[in-house]
From Swiss-Prot:
Residues 22-34 form a propeptide. SUPFAM superfamilies: Defensin-like. Its main location: secreted. Residues 1-21 form the signal peptide. Pfam families: Defensin_4. Disulfide bonds join C40-C73, C42-C66, C56-C74. It is found in: Secreted; Nematocyst. One of its GO terms (cellular component) is host cell postsynaptic membrane. The lineage of its organism: Eukaryota, Metazoa, Cnidaria, Anthozoa, Hexacorallia. This is Pi/alpha-stichotoxin-Hmg5b. The non-oxidized toxin is remarkably non-selective with activity on many different ion channels. Weakly and reversibly inhibits rat and human homomeric ASIC1 (isoform ASIC1a) (IC(50)=4.8 uM, and IC(50)=14.6 uM), and ASIC3 (IC(50)=15.9 uM). Molecular modeling interaction with ASIC1a suggests that this peptide hinders the collapse of acidic pockets and stabilizes nonconducting channels state. It activates several potassium channels including Kv1.1/KCNA1, Kv1.2/KCNA2, and drosophila Shaker IR. Keywords: Acetylcholine receptor inhibiting toxin, Calcium channel impairing toxin, Cleavage on pair of basic residues, Disulfide bond, Ion channel impairing toxin, Nematocyst, Neurotoxin, Oxidation, Postsynaptic neurotoxin, Potassium channel impairing toxin, Proton-gated sodium channel impairing toxin, Secreted, Signal, Toxin, Voltage-gated calcium channel impairing toxin, Voltage-gated potassium channel impairing toxin, Voltage-gated sodium channel impairing toxin. A synonymy between H.magnifica and R.crispa is controversial. The primary structure of this peptide is identical to Hcr 1b-2 from Radianthus crispa (AC C0HL52). InterPro entries: BDS_K_chnl_tox (IPR012414), Myo_ane_neurotoxin_sf (IPR023355).
Amino acid sequence: MDYQRLLFLFAVAMVITTTVALPKDTALMDGQLQKRGTPCKCHGYIGVYWFMLAGCPNGYGYNLSCPYFLGICCVKK
């Protein structure tokens, strides 16, 4: 019984931690678009790494791309 209580408390703590740690998308609700990528290098240029995408997203003006681990690096040249 003690093991089940401990597991339950751990699960509740994880849910609370996750809801507090994840940011709310208030900027997206206001019509402002936030960049959701990390810096990467592609042919000597600094770009934005997009995880789990096969191609660069439209509407950002990317004209150079390099395949990266499980994603793509997109560059505005």
